[in-house]
Curated annotation (Swiss-Prot):
Protein name as it appears in the record: Transketolase
Gene name, Swiss-Prot/TrEMBL: tkt
PANTHER family: TRANSKETOLASE, TRANSKETOLASE 1-RELATED
Residues at which substrate binds: 56, 289, 380, 407, 484, 492, 543
Cofactor (UniProt): Mg(2+); Ca(2+); Mn(2+); Co(2+)
EC number: 2.2.1.1
Residues that coordinate or bind thiamine diphosphate: 96, 144-146, 186, 215, 289, 460
Family of this protein: Belongs to the transketolase family.
Native source species: Aquifex aeolicus (strain VF5)
Keyword DNA damage attached: no
Subunit structure: Homodimer.
Pfam families noted in UniProt: Transket_pyr, Transketolase_C_1, Transketolase_N
GO cellular component terms given for this protein: cytosol
Length: 689
């Protein structure tokens, strides 16, 4: 075997680094410099909160040493290229501690200035109240809603596990990094953290390390008010390696524990006993959690620590020490670049696949391979067929469902299950854990290299709404697949029948909602989702069979690419325009036939995606919905909430503004008036009687 020189250098570098990390006594800093940097982070955070007259000083005072240790001794990263792909990831799930994170970023050489810290929580600053992905260099995820970051961390660790096993080859560990997440008491009270932790243990995500800022305090008081379970035993039962550090401020012990965790074959949960508002008169009380302490207490605390009263004081010694990480990070990335260059030369096809995935260059070659559907079928079934064609062209597309894979048709039949022992499987079984599924999908998207999708019934989108909203806020390319989209699902009744969900989802900024009308429109819904790289897409599908529209009679399904299109027109200027979505397009087409027979010129517009339609040029929008045609109707088996924007205040909306009933879907459509005859009659009654 011929070993390249650069390989030898890389091997030696990492072996030496490994020795240093497993022999802490060779790698230790003085306690003096540790304390100096930690206190700098603490008091920068306090000063940020005081200047903003808003924020959370308690966590930075109590937990800055944890963040310091990770960035100083544990993690590999490049402050000047925080997007280096093989970096370790750190997630502050307890996003209210953001001041601490920004202060650490400043100290360790990320692209933040002291002026940025002074602009904490101010309009258009780089230091918002809670971390926002894409806004602040170094922030890995958008956090604030407690529990979300924990689930994101699980998703990141899953992405690393899949990608490393898919792409790495012997001697070329091009994907090899850890995910660290700092969680609060509140994070662990949230149900989503339990859901996500259960999956992490099941999948044996050994490169996931969660650190609990165990300070015993919530806003309402001591955690004993509401929380008396044994959290450590809970995590142990979930399959985690568990440690508790009663001496939570012993840096060497914490470092030693993290290094042990890195050798485990399971995810690790480290409980660190801390004190909120450490060192202040308000220590261990809720009063120090979420508001400025005030000048008097700040000065008293600084004096106690022997700290200058000057605001935003940064000792030169501390800054010089932490800024060494800039050169260290640069060297780490350069070494990796050398390794990757060799990998690229030896495995060009794999490298090209990885690079396309990282750049979100998802193949669209599958479009022409999807069959033209002739038979009538549920759109969920068509979606499953489309997915299984797509999967051959997008090797890092990973999907799953919340225990509904056969119902929502999310299974990639040739590609196996993602499990602890089969990490290159592409079907994730989330169990009945919708919220965790949403946060994990987001985590995969944050990580990069994965095209994630997840499915459940539309009604259960409610269980994952915080994750959907965060995906939209963070501009993540995540695809949510929701079937059983109306009363058309039938006998399961109103507990399962969506009514308010369509407009509820459409109300989320930056979320696109696509509801195809038949099987042949489904592939274009997926195309929209793949092309949309700066935000999430929800694809809405039927349980019930819908007719496959005769495209020799009606417009091509390609019109979906513009969000809305004229699927059926009339001669000359229309008297009335009927707008419909999904399965109700069939109803609108039937109503058109009745109205035309009565001499009423009718246009039918298929509004598959309102958000995409709004992106079109004004000229196109006026062509589809001529301003001079004011007799407009919207037909959708859900709430009428947003349709008046399109039909006008004098328009007609045929909708469902009450909960459904348990009965066959076809019976319910007739009962609630979603029939061609009823729509036609309503139009005639309003304008032509």
């Amino acid at each position: 075997m011929v070993v390249q020189l650069d390989q030898i250098h890389f091997f030696i570098f990492h072996e030496v680094l490994k020795i240093f990390k497993t022999m802490p006594q060779l790698f230790k800093t003085s306690k003096k410099i540790d304390e100096l940097v930690i206190n700098t982070i603490r008091f920068l955070s306090v000063d940020m909160v005081e200047r903003a007259k808003s924020g959370h000083p308690g966590m930075p005072l109590g937990a800055s040493h944890i963040v310091y240790l990770l960035y100083d001794r544990i993690m590999k990263y490049n402050p000047k290229n925080p997007n280096w792909f093989n970096r370790d990831r750190f997630i502050l799930s307890a996003g209210h501690g953001s001041a601490m994170l920004y202060a650490a970023f400043y100290m360790f050489g990320f692209d933040l200035t002291l002026e940025d810290l002074k602009a904490f929580r101010q309009l258009n600053s780089k230091t918002p109240g809670h971390p926002e992905y894409g806004l602040t260099p170094g922030v890995e995820v958008t956090t604030g809603n407690l529990g979300q970051g924990f689930g994101n961390a699980v998703g990141m660790a899953m992405a690393e596990k899949f990608l490393s096993h898919y792409f790495n080859r012997e001697g070329y560990p091009v994907i090899d990094h850890y995910t660290y997440v700092l969680v609060s008491d509140g994070d662990l009270m949230e149900g989503v953290s339990y859901e996500a932790a259960s999956l992490a243990g099941h999948f044996k995500l050994n490169k996931l390390i969660a650190i609990w800022d165990n300070n015993h305090i919530t806003i309402d008081g001591d955690t004993k008010l509401t929380w008396t379970e044994d959290v450590l035993k809970r995590f142990e039962a979930l399959g985690w390696e568990v440690y508790h550090l009663e001496d939570g401020y012993n840096l060497d012990l914490l470092e030693e524990t993290i290094l042990k965790a890195k050798e485990s074959d399971k995810p690790t949960f480290i409980s660190v006993r801390t004190h909120i508002g450490y060192g202040t008169p308000l220590q261990d009380t809720p009063e120090v959690h979420g508001k400025p302490m005030g000048k008097e207490i700040v000065e008293e605390t600084k004096k106690k620590f022997g700290w200058p009263l000057e605001e935003f004081y940064v000792p030169e010694e501390a800054l010089n020490y932490t800024r060494r990480k800039v050169e260290e990070g640069k060297a780490l990335e350069e070494e990796w670049n050398k390794l990757y260059a060799e990998y690229r030369e030896k495995y060009p096809d794999l490298a090209q696949t990885l690079e396309k995935a990282l750049n979100k260059e998802w193949s669209l070659d599958w479009l022409e391979k999807v069959e033209e559907f002739k038979e009538d079928m549920p759109t969920r079934k068509a979606s499953g067929k489309v997915l299984n064609v797509m999967a051959d062209y997008i090797p890092t597309m990973i999907g799953g469902s919340a225990d509904l894979s056969e119902s929502v048709n999310t299974v990639l039949k040739k590609y196996g299950d993602f499990e602890a022992d089969t990490p290159t499987g592409r079907n994730v079984h989330y169990g009945v854990r919708e919220h965790a599924m949403g946060t994990i999908l987001n985590g995969m998207a944050y990580h990069g290299g994965i095209l994630p999708y997840g499915g459940t019934f539309l009604i259960f989108s409610e269980y994952m709404r915080p994750a959907i909203r965060t995906a939209a806020l963070a501009n993540l390319q995540v695809i949510f697949v929701y079937s059983h989209d109306s009363i058309g699902l039938g006998e399961d009744g109103p507990t399962h029948q969506p009514v308010e969900q369509l407009w509820s989802l459409r109300s989320i900024p930056n979320l696109w909602v696509v509801r195809p009308a038949d099987a042949n429109e489904v592939k274009y819904a997926w195309e929209i989702a793949l092309k949309r790289k700066n935000g999430p897409t929800a694809i809405i599908l039927t349980r019930q069979k819908v007719k496959t529209i005769d495209r020799s009679k009606y417009a091509s399904p390609e019109g979906v690419r513009k969000g809305a299109y004229v699927i059926a027109d009339t001669e000359g200027k229309p008297d009335v325009v009927i707008i419909a979505t999904g399965s109700e397009v069939q109803v609108a087409l039937g109503a058109k036939e009745i109205l035309e027979q009565k001499g009423i010129k009718t246009r039918v517009v298929n509004m598959a995606c309102c958000e995409l339609f709004e992106e079109q040029p004004e000229e196109y929008k006026r062509e589809v919905l001529p301003p001079e045609v004011t007799k407009r109707v919207a037909v959708e088996a859900g709430r009428d909430t947003g349709w008046y924007k399109y039909v006008g205040s004098d328009g007609l909306v045929i909708s469902l503004n009450e909960f459904g009933k348990s009965a066959p879907g076809s019976v319910l459509f007739e009962y609630y008036g979603f029939t061609p005859e009823n729509v036609a009659n309503k139009v005639i009654e309003k304008w032509f009687s």
